[in-house]
Design a protein with these regions (language model features):
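Flexible "cap/lid" loop of the alpha/beta hydrolase fold
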Residues: 83-116, 157-160
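Conserved alpha/beta-hydrolase "acid-adjacent" motif
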Residues: 190-196
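Conserved alpha/beta-hydrolase catalytic His-Asp/Glu region
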Residues: 119-173
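Catalytic histidine-centered segment of alpha/beta-hydrolase-like enzymes
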Residues: 215-228
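Acidic beta-to-alpha connecting loop that harbors the catalytic carboxylate
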Residues: 11, 187-189, 214-216
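Short beta-strand/loop motif that positions the catalytic acidic residue
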Residues: 177, 183-185, 189
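Conserved HGGG/HGGXW glycine-rich cap/lid loop of the alpha/beta-hydrolase fold
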Residues: 1-46
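Gly/Ala-rich beta-loop-alpha elbow adjacent to hydrolase catalytic centers
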Residues: 64-68, 72
Length: 241
């Protein structure tokens, strides 16, 4: 079904953060069925991809925000022709920097954040909302909107999500998936540096990559209209190919 899209949420946030984008996609693409998918709430990070694969129907477009995009990438590579195309929003192939992928959050910054989360999950989640909204036009309002959309789930599941953010490397999955790919980044993102866009394009020049300037990591919430326009145009091109 080429008119169906599964939209995966980001770490610690529920469907509400993606609902404005989903509504615009439905309004502007009346034949498009859009389903927002919450991330797994399992304490075992190794089980997340299998859980998503079992829960999400095949023959859909896969899209995701941040960690959701990283997982959508892995799932697209696993499904191959059973995935119509891949769209990621503020998703770095490697969220934490590596020697061969420096365009990411410095490893020591990530480790400090993860340690802080284990000591004080509630305070760290609030800090994450502030970081996700930093660089936006109205960061304070964005942070409040993100707080309202927080996913209520076990701390162990949130910790598993952080483990995945540290461990996942989507480069090989992107290379293996031969369907259409669109990767959108935010120019003022405080969590995924905009430099990752050029790094990705240099590494995999056959995919579509763009940077939405003057936008924060909360890209699908802050710039829903721009993202909906870009996604629908990309999907239309994919169906024409």
């Amino acid at each position: 079904m080429r008119d169906r899209l599964m939209l995966l949420s980001g770490w610690a946030f529920g469907p509400a953060a993606l609902e404005p984008l989903a509504e615009l996609l439905r309004e502007r693409g009346p034949h498009l069925q859009v389903d927002i998918v919450s991330l797994p709430t399992l304490g075992d990070p190794d089980a997340w991809l299998d859980e998503l694969d079992a829960r999400l129907p095949a023959d859909r477009w896969l899209a995701g925000w941040s960690l959701g995009g990283m997982l959508a990438t892995q799932l697209a590579a696993r499904r191959g022709d059973a995935c119509n195309g891949l769209i990621t929003l503020c998703s770095n192939p490697c969220f934490r920097s590596r020697d061969d992928w420096p365009a990411a959050m410095p490893a020591e910054v990530f480790e400090a954040f993860h340690a802080a989360f284990r000591l004080g999950p509630e305070e760290t989640r609030k800090r994450f909302s502030l970081l996700a909204s930093r660089g936006g036009f109205d960061a304070r309002t964005l942070a409040r909107q993100l707080e309202v959309s927080r996913l209520e789930c076990p701390v162990a599941a949130l910790d598993a999500g952080l483990q995945l953010l540290a461990a996942l490397d989507g480069r090989e999955a992107m290379r293996r998936f031969v369907g259409p790919q669109l990767h959108l980044f935010a120019g003022n993102d405080a969590l995924v540096p905009a430099a990752a866009a050029q790094a990705l394009l240099d590494w995999l020049p056959d995919v579509e990559v763009d940077v939405i300037e003057n936008a924060s990591h909360a890209l699908p919430l802050e710039r829903a209209e721009d993202i909906a326009t870009a996604m629908l145009a990309f999907m239309q091109r994919g169906e024409e190919d």
